[in-house]
């Protein structure tokens, strides 16, 4: 199934049913009085997080959704039936944004979590409601109210504890294959990974974490180059970033320069995301000569001026993976405990996530607008070229 992580849809709640104008008609009851019932409420539109869905493809081609209207009231004080709510299932991790006012309506991060995006219209009132001592035969009713309508954008960000970051062919997919049951495609050409892949890493029976692998970044990614820019937003929800560096690249490029480029693109895309906890993972060390391995890795750390955690692994050979996974699990558990015990830490993390969301959203909107303008300019240029090629002949 095609992976779609963005969609724009129009939702409209149902209209409330109209109130009924009716009077009691019964033998030997010449003045039965009003008996018009109220209408039913219109159905609302609700979004619900469903763990069985992992893409927004259902909303890419069907753009309009409307809930049922409420039924009108009837005589005999019969109330009309309410319109059924329309429940739209979306993947866990979906953010809902009102595009008309550019406001985030909610974030569905738990299975079964719901958010009402369009309230159904209030029911109309029958003429019974207007009966009084001075108006015993009212002919007044009230129509049902229209339901709310919105243009909303759905943005899916995968839920993972750890995100893999690096250039194409750095070995990220091989790493996720080596530490989890996920089996992404692996090959020796760039951009083998086209969509995010998730894998569950089980350290022990009841200790596990989720890791996300996104397409590799290249220089200029923050300006729209390559595939990685489309999926960098999926790293927003992660707690920890693993920067995977190929210490023995096939093109003989400098690993340090490559690592610096990735960090620069990350900072340009979102400073808050770049400030996230990040560990350095030096991959493919099995390709280095045994007597040179330690010196080469130490030189990379020195030139990067790296002071954080670093690991030397071979994802293909499985070297160093167990220690890496154990340390990640311990860090995640310790971090979760700190957030649980210290409200200030939890609040700081929440604010940081909001800042990342805002920066990522603004950057993606800017790039989308740039692409739209570029397409418009290219189309206008093509039209001008076509006009210049036209020759007009006048027949006598």
From Swiss-Prot:
Disulfide bonds: none annotated. Its cofactor is Mg(2+). Mg(2+) binds at residues 173, 193. Coiled coil: none annotated. Its main location: cytoplasm. Residues 160-333 form the OBG-type G domain. Signal peptide: none annotated. Keywords: Cytoplasm, GTP-binding, Hydrolase, Magnesium, Metal-binding, Nucleotide-binding. PROSITE patterns: G_OBG (PS51710), GTP1_OBG (PS00905), OBG (PS51883). One of its GO terms (cellular component) is cytoplasm. Residues 381-396 have a biased composition (Acidic residues). Belongs to the TRAFAC class OBG-HflX-like GTPase superfamily. OBG GTPase family. Monomer. This is GTPase Obg. It comes from Hahella chejuensis (strain KCTC 2396). The gene is obg.
């Amino acid at each position: 199934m095609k992976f779609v992580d963005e969609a724009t849809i129009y939702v409209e709640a149902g209209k409330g049913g109209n109130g009924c104008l009716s009077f009691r008609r019964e033998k030997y009851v010449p003045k039965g009085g009003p008996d018009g019932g109220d209408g039913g409420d219109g159905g609302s539109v609700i979004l619900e997080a469903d763990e069985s869905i992992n893409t927004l493809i259902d909303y890419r081609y069907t753009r309009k959704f409307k809930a049922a209207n409420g039924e009108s009231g009837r005589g005999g004080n019969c109330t009309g039936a309410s319109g059924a709510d329309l429940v739209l299932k979306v993947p866990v991790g979906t953010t809902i944004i009102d595009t008309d006012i550019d406001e985030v309506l909610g974030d569905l991060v738990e299975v079964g979590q719901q958010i009402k995006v369009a309230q159904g219209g209030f029911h109309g009132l029958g003429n019974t409601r207007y009966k009084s001592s001075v108006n015993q035969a009212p002919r007044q009713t009230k129509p049902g109210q229209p339901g709310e309508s919105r243009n909303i954008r759905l943005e899916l960000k995968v839920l993972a504890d750890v995100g893999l970051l690096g250039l194409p062919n750095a070995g990220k997919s091989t790493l996720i294959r080596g530490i989890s049951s996920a089996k992404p495609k692996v090959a020796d050409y760039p951009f083998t990974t086209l969509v995010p892949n998730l894998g569950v890493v089980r350290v022990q029976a009841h200790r596990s974490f989720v890791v996300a692998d996104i397409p590799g970044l290249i220089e200029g990614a923050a300006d729209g180059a390559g595939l990685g820019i489309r999926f960098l937003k999926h790293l927003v929800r992660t707690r920890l970033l693993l920067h995977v560096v190929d210490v023995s690249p096939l093109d003989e490029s400098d690993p340090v320069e490559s690592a610096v480029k990735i960090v620069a693109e990350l900072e340009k895309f979102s400073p808050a995301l770049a400030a996230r906890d990040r560990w350095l993972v030096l991959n493919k060390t099995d390709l280095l000569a045994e007597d040179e391995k330690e010196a080469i890795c130490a030189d990379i750390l020195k030139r990067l001026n790296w002071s954080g955690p670093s690991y030397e692994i071979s994802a293909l050979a499985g070297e160093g993976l167990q220690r890496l996974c154990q340390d990640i699990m311990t860090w995640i558990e310790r971090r979760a405990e700190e957030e649980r015990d210290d409200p200030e830490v939890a609040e700081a993390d929440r604010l940081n996530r909001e800042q990342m969301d805002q920066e990522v959203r603004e950057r993606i909107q800017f790039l989308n607008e740039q692409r739209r303008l570029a397409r418009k300019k290219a189309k206008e240029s093509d039209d001008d070229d076509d006009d210049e090629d036209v020759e007009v002949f006048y027949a006598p």
